[in-house]
A protein has these predicted regions:
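Compact, aliphatic and Gly/Pro-tolerant "microcore" segments centered on a short helix or tight beta-hairpin
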Residues: 1-32
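Short Gly/Pro-enriched turn/cap motifs at secondary-structure boundaries
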Residues: 1-5, 29-32, 46-48, 74-81
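Alpha-helical interface subdomain recognition
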Residues: 7-9, 16-21, 84-86, 103, ...
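Flexible, small-/acidic-enriched active-site or ligand-binding loops
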Residues: 9, 62-93
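Conserved hydrophobic/aromatic beta-strand scaffold that supports enzyme active sites
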Residues: 11-13, 38-42, 56-58, 82-89
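Short, glycine-/Ser/Thr-/acidic-enriched flexible segments
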Residues: 28, 35-36, 46-48, 62-64, ...
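Long, acidic (Asp/Glu-rich), low-complexity accessory segments flanking structured domains
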Residues: 89-107
Length: 255
C-alpha cells in the first residue's frame, strides 16, 4: 500500500514453493475488487534485482488466502467499488505467472499509456455532462427578465467551458490515434490526461456555480460530476507525475 506513484517500491512478495507461487502482502485502492473474479497482482520475486525483480500474476479472487478487507467510502466514482485486499499465503499454480519472471513492471508500464488515454476520455465525458447540464439550466433559469445564459458573465463561462472541453477531446483523440497506430505516445498520453483531468475539475466547478444553490443539492447531477471529476487527477498517475513525464520527454524534442 505504501508504493503509490513509486511503483518499484512494492512490498508484496511472491515465493516459489514446491512448484507453486505463494503470495504475501497487501494492496490498496483496488478497483472493482468485490466484483472481479480474477486479479492481476504485481509482487517482488527477487528483492536483489530492484525493479527487474517484480513479476505479474493472475490470481483468482476465490483463492484461499485472498481476502478483501474493506470497501472504501469515497467522495466520488461510487459506481465503482474500491477495496483493500490482503494476500496471506495465497498459493497459485506456477502457470499463473503472467509473462516472464521479472517483467512485471514492464507489463504494468506497457498498459499505462492506454490507461491514461482512457482517464482523459473519462474526464472529457464528465466535463461534457456537466457543461450540458449547465447549458440547459442557463436556458431555463430566468433572472432579471431573461435566461441567465443571455447574461454576459454566464455566457462567457459557457464559452470557456465549451472551448476547454473541445481542446481536451482533441488531445485525447490525438493520443488515441497514435496508440492505435502502434506509435510511441508516452508524452501525448500524459498531456491528454493532465489537461483533460484538470479541465474537468474547472468545468464542473463552473457548472456548479452556474446552478447556484441548486448545484449544491443532491437532487441535481452537477454535484456528482464535480465529485467524480476530482479522481481523474489522481489515479493512473497523478498530475504531478504527468508533468514529470512530459518534461522528461522534452529532452528528445526536435528543434
Amino acid at each position: 500500500p505504501q508504493a503509490g506513484s513509486e511503483a518499484p517500491n512494492l512490498r508484496t512478495r511472491a515465493e516459489l514453493r514446491d512448484g507453486r507461487w505463494v503470495l504475501n502482502g497487501a494492496k490498496q485502492f483496488v478497483s472493482n475488487g468485490r466484483r472481479a473474479g480474477l486479479a492481476i497482482v504485481f509482487a517482488v520475486t527477487d528483492a536483489t534485482l530492484g525493479k527487474k525483480g517484480i513479476s505479474a500474476f493472475l490470481v483468482p479472487t476465490n483463492t484461499p488466502g485472498f481476502r478483501i478487507d474493506r470497501s472504501e467510502h469515497k467522495m466520488g466514482i461510487r459506481a465503482s467499488d474500491t477495496c483493500a485486499i490482503t494476500l496471506d499465503d495465497c498459493s497459485i499454480p506456477a502457470a499463473n505467472l503472467l509473462g516472464e519472471r521479472g517483467k512485471g513492471l514492464s507489463i504494468a508500464l506497457s498498459n499505462l499509456e492506454g490507461g491514461r488515454i482512457g482517464i482523459a476520455a473519462q474526464a472529457v465525458g464528465i466535463a461534457r455532462a456537466a457543461f450540458e447540464a449547465a447549458l440547459l439550466y442557463s436556458r431555463e433559469r430566468v433572472q432579471f427578465d431573461k435566461p441567465i445564459g443571455e447574461h454576459q458573465s454566464i455566457a462567457n463561462l459557457l464559452a470557456d467551458m465549451h472551448t476547454q472541453i473541445n481542446a481536451a477531446r482533441l488531445l485525447t483523440l490525438h493520443a488515441a490515434r497514435l496508440r492505435s497506430a502502434g506509435q510511441p505516445c508516452l508524452s501525448e498520453a500524459s498531456q491528454a490526461k493532465l489537461f483533460a483531468s484538470e479541465m474537468a475539475e474547472r468545468v464542473c466547478s463552473k457548472a456548479l456555480q452556474i446552478h447556484g444553490g441548486y448545484g449544491y443539492l443532491e437532487d441535481f447531477p452537477v454535484q456528482r460530476y464535480y465529485r467524480d471529476a476530482r479522481i481523474t487527477q489522481i489515479y493512473e498517475g497523478a498530475s504531478e507525475i504527468q508533468r514529470l513525464l512530459i518534461a522528461r520527454e522534452l529532452k528528445h524534442y526536435a528543434l
